[in-house]
Amino acid sequence: MDWTWSILFLVAAATGAHSQVQLVQSGAEVKKPGASVKVSCKASGYTFTSYGISWVRQAPGQGLEWMGWISAYNGNTNYAQKLQGRVTMTTDTSTSTAYMELRSLRSDDTAVYYCAR
């Protein structure tokens, strides 16, 4: 059977008292098992390197699952144990963008993926 599924990526936005903080993610993608996906999260409205970026996901009918965190200041990362070896988080400070790459995709990776400050 040819398994495919949708991996959805939404826009996360928050409003501060004096400026609008926005995290704008790349669009929905459809991937096959074994493939990889790289999601972008472009930040604006604040100093990118002053905060870390977390990645979470929500599978259908499930709660939020924390995937990991990256420091936008120095690139230090902390990944969920269950994703170790399959996930890589990076940042590009020149464009205030964070990236999350997930490899060797499986059916249970079907989820809505979010970045958050």
UniProtKB/Swiss-Prot annotation:
This is Immunoglobulin heavy variable 1-18. Residues 78-115 are annotated as: Framework-3. Residues 53-69 are annotated as: Framework-2. One of its GO terms (molecular function) is antigen binding. GO terms for cellular component: extracellular region; immunoglobulin complex; plasma membrane. Residues 45-52 are annotated as: Complementarity-determining-1. Keywords: Adaptive immunity, Cell membrane, Disulfide bond, Immunity, Immunoglobulin, Immunoglobulin domain, Membrane, Secreted, Signal. Immunoglobulins are composed of two identical heavy chains and two identical light chains; disulfide-linked. Gene3D superfamilies: Immunoglobulins. InterPro entries: Ig-like_dom, Ig-like_dom_sf, Ig-like_fold, Ig_V-set, IgHV. PROSITE patterns: IG_LIKE (PS50835). Residues 20-44 are annotated as: Framework-1. Residues 1-19 form the signal peptide. The gene is IGHV1-18. It is found in: Secreted; Cell membrane. Residues 20-117 form the Ig-like domain.
